Curated annotation (Swiss-Prot):
Membrane topology: Multi-pass membrane protein
Record bears the keyword Repeat: yes
InterPro entries cross-referenced by the UniProt entry: Mit_carrier, Mitochondrial_sb/sol_carrier, Mt_carrier_dom_sf, Mtm1-like
PANTHER family, alphabetized: FI19922P1-RELATED (PTHR45760), MITOCHONDRIAL GLUTATHIONE TRANSPORTER SLC25A40-RELATED (PTHR45760:SF5)
Family that this chain belongs to: Belongs to the mitochondrial carrier (TC 2.A.29) family.
Organism: Mus musculus
Gene name of this polypeptide: Slc25a40
Example of a GO cellular component annotation carried by this entry: mitochondrial inner membrane
Protein name in UniProt: Mitochondrial glutathione transporter SLC25A40
Length: 337
């Protein structure tokens, strides 16, 4: 009689609601841990080049980028507080010592209104699409992460894009609900519904390829590390490492589109706020050619290190905490079976 070989432990798939809870928890943890890096970066930028009224800057909570408009000429705004910082570490310590620990999360709550729903939609759609495609194509089909990642990101960006435009408008003008309704109605009547998706195209060009590369590399790297370790299920460190490496590769590969997206959206909102006449809307490829002509090919990779510093920990924390949440619910499902 042959000895029985131990197989993988029984698992029950997590429900969509459980996936939503896991992704929401991961989103909150990611934003709490990554936001201080961007707050320090923005404070240093504001110190070296003070933001004039109407100036736009990017704020990242680790989940998504948000366009913010400097609307206050006084020094009351969190990004205009004086600090006399000598560098990143000095800024971090002085903010902590002089302003309190809460200042490291300045500006976070309003951005989470968009970021958490976007993350929940994205991760839940990815999981549901992956499960569906596996039933049709098989468990080991390598194209599944690419297809699911592309469709999930496309959907999340499309849903959130008009809401983010409205959020930015409210933040820049302090509109009442009635004025906001009038703004949306006027915009739709003048330029059609498509005007609510301004800035959508460059975001899609950056985020969709990022998502495809990220999920493809993450799933394959996670599987490879499990095989090398002789494990059926990935550990927290395997998920963390796979997320960090996959995020860094995707961040480098899509950086040119990030440079273009930042330039287009900053110009768009500066014109909106200051009522400048709208310039000729250049395509992504035209902007890229102009950047190469002005700064050389390296201009397309401006800000590589800051992007990696932000993206790598965000990807690692988000995916590892999300997978941890899924593992918790899987155990609960098995026990309650």
């Amino acid at each position: 009689m042959e000895p029985e070989t131990e197989g993988p432990p029984p698992t029950i798939p997590v429900t969509p609601l459980q996936q939503m809870i896991a992704s929401c928890t991961g989103a909150v943890l990611t934003s709490l841990m990554v936001t201080p890096l961007d707050v320090v970066k923005i404070r240093l930028q504001a110190q070296n080049n003070p933001f004039p009224k109407g100036k736009c800057f990017l704020y990242s909570n680790g989940l998504m980028d948000h366009m913010c408009v400097c609307e206050e000429e006084s020094k009351k705004a969190w990004y205009k507080k004086p600090g006399n910082f000598r560098g990143t570490l000095d800024a971090f310590l002085k903010i902590l010592r002089n302003e309190g620990i809460k200042s490291l999360w300045s500006g976070l709550p309003p951005t989470l209104v968009m970021a958490i729903p976007a993350t929940v939609i994205y991760f839940t759609c990815y999981e549901q699409l992956s499960a569906f495609l596996k039933t049709k194509l098989g468990e080991n089909e390598t194209r599944i992460p690419i297809v699911a990642g592309v469709v999930a990101r496309f959907g999340a960006v499309t849903v959130i894009s008009p809401l983010e435009l409205i959020r930015t408008k409210v933040q820049s003008k302090k509109f009442s609900y009635k004025e906001l309704y009038q703004f949306v109605s006027m915009r739709v009547s003048e330029d059609g519904w498509i005007s609510l998706w301004k800035g959508w195209a460059p975001t899609i060009l950056r985020d969709v390829p990022f998502s495809a590369m990220y999920w493809y590399n993450y799933e394959n790297l996670k599987r490879w590390l499990c095989e090398k370790s002789g494990l059926y299920e990935p550990t927290f460190m395997i998920n963390f490492t796979s997320g960090a490496l996959s995020g860094s590769f995707a961040a480098v590969a899509t950086l040119p589109f990030d440079v273009v997206k930042t330039q287009k959206q900053t110009q768009l909102w500066t014109n909106e706020y200051c009522k400048f006449p709208a310039p000729l809307d250049m395509s992504t490829w035209t902007i890229m050619k102009n950047i190469v002509a002005d700064k050389g090919f390296s201009g397309l990779f401006t800000g590589l290190i800051p992007r990696l510093v932000k993206i790598v920990p965000a990807c690692a924390i988000m995916i590892s905490s999300y997978e941890l949440g899924k593992s918790f619910f899987q155990k609960q499902n098995v026990e309650s079976r």
